[in-house]
Amino acid sequence: MASPPSSGQPRPPPPPPPPARLLLPLLLSLLLSLAPGAWGWARGAPRPPPSSPPLSIMGLMPLTKEVAKGSIGRGVLPAVELAIEQIRNESLLRPYFLDLRLYDTECDNAKGLKAFYDAIKYGPNHLMVFGGVCPSVTSIIAESLQGWNLVQLSFAATTPVLADKKKYPYFFRTVPSDNAVNPAILKLLKHFRWRRVGTLTQDVQRFSEVRNDLTGVLYGEDIEISDTESFSNDPCTSVKKLKGNDVRIILGQFDQNMAAKVFCCAFEESMFGSKYQWIIPGWYEPAWWEQVHVEANSSRCLRRSLLAAMEGYIGVDFEPLSSKQIKTISGKTPQQYEREYNSKRSGVGPSKFHGYAYDGIWVIAKTLQRAMETLHASSRHQRIQDFNYTDHTLGRIILNAMNETNFFGVTGQVVFRNGERMGTIKFTQFQDSREVKVGEYNAVADTLEIINDTIRFQGSEPPKDKTIILEQLRKISLPLYSILSALTILGMIMASAFLFFNIKNRNQKLIKMSSPYMNNLIILGGMLSYASIFLFGLDGSFVSEKTFETLCTVRTWILTVGYTTAFGAMFAKTWRVHAIFKNVKMKKKIIKDQKLLVIVGGMLLIDLCILICWQAVDPLRRTVERYSMEPDPAGRDISIRPLLEHCENTHMTIWLGIVYAYKGLLMLFGCFLAWETRNVSIPALNDSKYIGMSVYNVGIMCIIGAAVSFLTRDQPNVQFCIVALVIIFCSTITLCLVFVPKLITLRTNPDAATQNRRFQFTQNQKKEDSKTSTSVTSVNQASTSRLEGLQSENHRLRMKITELDKDLEEVTMQLQDTPEKTTYIKQNHYQELNDILSLGNFTESTDGGKAILKNHLDQNPQLQWNTTEPSRTCKDPIEDINSPEHIQRRLSLQLPILHHAYLPSIGGVDASCVSPCVSPTASPRHRHVPPSFRVMVSGL
């Protein structure tokens, strides 16, 4: 029920009401005995002189003990008493005195409205309304003040709704609103350079309004709100979402009961400690965590867990009293006032709003004083005590006087901006189970003051507003690059030495017979492959982005051309060995080095076509691949996001598929040729065996290197190491296989090339006479001109043999037709022929001789007469030309003639020799007859 004013009249009974003056003494004594302290001025305040007219002020606040917020009203009454007493002592309103009439609203809308209307109807004409604690009651009354031309001043209503001046134009408050903390929070965020925050709000209108206003303030200052979460009962889901969005600075708006749940959830999610900062309301009850930890325990959150999660949170609230040692409008410092207040309340619980109530009384007094001055200066001669609820002019004068308020009170500088108090906001921090003031924000001056060495963070520095992502380029290790570069340089020096060796000894038979031009191509390809290693190791840590993009193309071209040059040369040499020795019908075919160069050139042409199309249609570009974040190895509060540079394009898979398909087919065919010629052995003359081994080496290592480098594309050091080692290994092994045997042979036995020119080739397919070795000719492919000369000479000798066969046949027929001369021919003629044509050293029984005999018989079928012919069946051995004696005689004539006819072309008897009977060794032009040439003759 409403508390009757000290000099007013109680609620009248049904008409006719009794005069108020008859009940006044009784009501005063009754109310003072039942509710001591309900009126601050009634307890020890000096009585105004009887002739002083009162200036009535309506006081609306909860006073009863049954209401929780009644303690606020009872707690501020001692401060109100002090203010009224000091105002009267200073005669600030002389000849008037301030008359505050209190009405209990009980924090109930109906009872508050009834008390307001009773004061309007039955009380005196109140100049102003002082009070308003409960938001719902205050908002209802404040909305109707304009109709009564009354200005209301609240000392405890902090709800942001009342800041709407369109709806509440006559409402003021000395206490900052809940929204007043938002500029202070903004200043704190800027001070610690926190540019990214998240909000966690309880689904209550009061908190939602603060959150909405804070959102506008932060957006205006370009501070990112990365996540906005709200909850009704269970905050754990919202807390988990905040963590998932990497929110480090959390701005909370919830009551103290929900605060315990929030911090328990934060403990479960590990959202506390040096990486996180919680900023929550600071108006909770003292030691609020002690009151709610029992409920927290019921949710499986122990007290120590709650305190651990709370450690370091920052509370934001208005400052109850100014901390400055400055005299206020009353002539006393805030500290002196506080001591007087504590001594005066005498058992009444303190209220944190008492300073705002004290300053509020002074605001009312200064407003009325200014209004009286305005009336006195006007020509209307109106008195302030003549105010009534329909006096719009005086109401506007009081409203304007309120807006002009500016003085220093116990709560700081008292200034209104659009009816809102520009007060002081304090910051407290929870440290070691207690709240410590660490700073304050002055809204008038817009300054933030952090008390030295009071604010503490659990880390060495304030938490970061987000996980600091350090984008780190994964680069090639400099020591690794240096080591592999050194190996590459050694390989290039070795290749240069081989090139020098190959060029210097190009006229040596050993080098000539292994195609020195093709060997030069192998060296060139190896050196290009070596050079590509330097380019593959250059990344963003060594070169610029533009240069890296250029290197993408250059290194691809160099490696491709180098591979094709080296492998193509080996492939061509392997193909020539296969073409010569796999098909005996091709033994008369000449495969020159020029043809091999054409093969290599064709391969390079295909490469160039692919590379040019690739570059023109879809060139390689520098791309940066970002990987998932990794913790800092040094333990810092940062996360590392690895970056890796790649050379890619839009259709990378297609182009690589084309290149791999072409190279793969070439490699498979090369391995096939190497396998087919695996049993070809050409000691000291040919390097086909080593070329085949090189083909195997390159094929296997390229497959392994391509696969492993693809799997390790996210590890540049491993990938570069594998690619470089594969290139070094393939190039080095290939060059060593091709040149080291030649180098050793040339150093140890320079004549090895001319000592053994025979080789055996075993066919894979079984023939009727399996395990039979066929002697074939080793053709010096490097000496094309010499080979052509030998072929011409061979043709000439064959024609000469044909003529000799005809002559011999005629002689034989003559012998058969003249038997009477047989004895003479047998005894004299054959002896003469033997003396003339026989050679003393032509009796060696070698395989080459047998081959000559066999081939000669095969190529002269006319010598094999039909022994069954009737005319040739004479029993006389002399008359039978097919008898062994005749055959022996014929061979004794043919072979010496054949031998001497061929000798000049192969370095035998000089054509100018006087007699063929002279030994070939006697000729100054005599040379050792190579076995290969003897075999060649046998195939005529």
From Swiss-Prot:
It comes from the Eukaryota. One of its GO terms (molecular function) is protein heterodimerization activity. Residues 41-482, 543-550, 618-653, 712-719 are extracellular. The modification Phosphoserine is found at residues 775, 778, 883, 892, 912, 915, 919, 923. The keyword Glycoprotein applies. It comes from Mus musculus. The lineage of its organism: Eukaryota, Metazoa, Chordata, Craniata, Vertebrata. Component of a heterodimeric G-protein coupled receptor for GABA, formed by GABBR1 and GABBR2. Within the heterodimeric GABA receptor, only GABBR1 seems to bind agonists, while GABBR2 mediates coupling to G proteins. Ligand binding causes a conformation change that triggers signaling via guanine nucleotide-binding proteins (G proteins) and modulates the activity of down-stream effectors, such as adenylate cyclase. The keyword Disulfide bond applies. PANTHER family: GABA-B RECEPTOR, GAMMA-AMINOBUTYRIC ACID TYPE B RECEPTOR SUBUNIT 2. This is Gamma-aminobutyric acid type B receptor subunit 2.
